[in-house]
């Protein structure tokens, strides 16, 4: 119902992307920049920590580009960022190595191209009762947040999680009416 086009399962992807055969203690680290501008000190700092950790443990350092915010995407930002990293001696073992260029067995390394993978896991969580669609608008969520802040209550649960216990029929009607939704985790605690 929520992901009708998704026919793969988490098991499929776990077979497609098996655990890496690395020595014990090796770390796989990543740098996941948004292509929204140039490399800045915060990027460089987190990237250097990930890179040094991977290299010190004979692990793998990869770059995965978080390109889901298309509104803020800056043309050429990926190339500029990779060039900036190379100035500091940071070169990925795998992942994005150029504008629209990738290497490695765990591709795709552009976040937007991994959508089906994430949706397969999301669908599995829903089927297990561990996630649910929330149809609350941004305005409704702002009102809920303001009410909770006034009462000094934290978190999105109980009476505030208005969509948590919708029936399958209610969910179906909302989806069929074109209502937008986001997926929320359903904690049993």
Where are these regions (language model features)?
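Active-site cores that bind ATP or allylic diphosphates and position pyrophosphate for catalysis
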Residues: 124, 131-189
